[in-house]
Regions:
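DNA polymerase processivity clamps
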Residues: 2-254
């Protein structure tokens, strides 16, 4: 338990939760920057028995991560009890933004907060990382049902995506120290899954992304004329034609 004096009010910090700083910074790349959707201007932290989840979205992309519970900076043994059952917290982006990662930075930041009272007042938060402490209050709002966005069935049908969204996942991979190229699992005009965080990137952590496809507008649905450059027109291959061509290529290579 941590007691914090703040002006005329004394805050009793009942929970101290260790959050992987790199996972937190990576997930935060998906938050919105618009004031009108202030409830999305932060990372939603949820507490379960043996893990926590982190979620951020701006309505066009989503990044979600899971981290197994760790205890590296407890003031008292078992002081946090994992915070299972506590209401989720929207951790403000301006607190996360001030975390600066370096090669010698610690792995974890400590999120301290008090229990949610009956008065439903915003909880006072502290985010400690590498000898710095950020203080503030949780975002007072209900976070959207983000789990409904993540698809559980993928068609493989191709779609177009805003390049800026794809860049976000590349940045997230870099934050967690991965050199792997993010892969979009196309799902037609439905939300697509994105693999960007290899399982061995962060110990005890898993993460994925969701990208919303663009609705193609204009006259670019058809293949562009290329005969003037290549000497022949481009044609679409049917799945069967592509399969046969790939089979023959592999046979020739064997």
């Amino acid at each position: 338990m941590v007691v914090v004096e703040n002006r005329a009010r004394c805050y009793i910090m009942q929970y101290n939760i260790e959050i992987n700083a790199r996972l937190l910074k990576a997930v935060a790349l998906a938050v919105t920057k618009t004031e009108t959707r202030y409830y999305l201007n932060g990372v939603y932290v949820e507490f379960f028995g043996d893990y926590i989840t982190l979620t951020a979205t701006d309505g066009h992309k989503l990044i979600a991560g899971r981290q197994m519970r760790v205890f590296t900076n407890q003031s008292e043994p078992g002081a946090s009890d994992g915070a299972a059952g506590q209401a989720g917290i929207i951790l403000p982006f301006d607190m996360i933004e001030k975390i600066k990662l370096g090669k010698k930075s610690p792995d974890y930041a400590t999120l301290s907060f008090d229990a949610k009272g009956d008065n439903l007042a915003a909880r006072f938060l502290q985010l400690r990382f590498d000898a710095t402490t950020q203080s503030g209050f949780e975002v007072e709002a209900s976070y959207p049902a983000a789990r409904r966005v993540a698809p559980v069935s993928i068609t493989g049908e191709t779609a177009a995506f805003d390049p800026e969204i794809l860049i976000t996942f590349s940045k997230a991979a870099k934050v967690v120290g991965s050199l792997a190229t993010p892969v979009v699992h196309h799902n037609g005009l439905n939300p697509a899954l994105v693999s960007w965080c290899p399982a061995d990137s962060l110990p005890g952590c898993l993460a994925f992304g969701v990208a919303m496809p663009l609705r193609v507008q204009g006259d670019f649905q058809e293949l562009p004329p290329v005969a003037w450059f290549t000497g022949q027109s481009a044609v679409r291959s049917t799945p069967e034609d592509k399969f046969k061509a790939e089979t023959e290529r592999l046979k020739a290579k064997a």
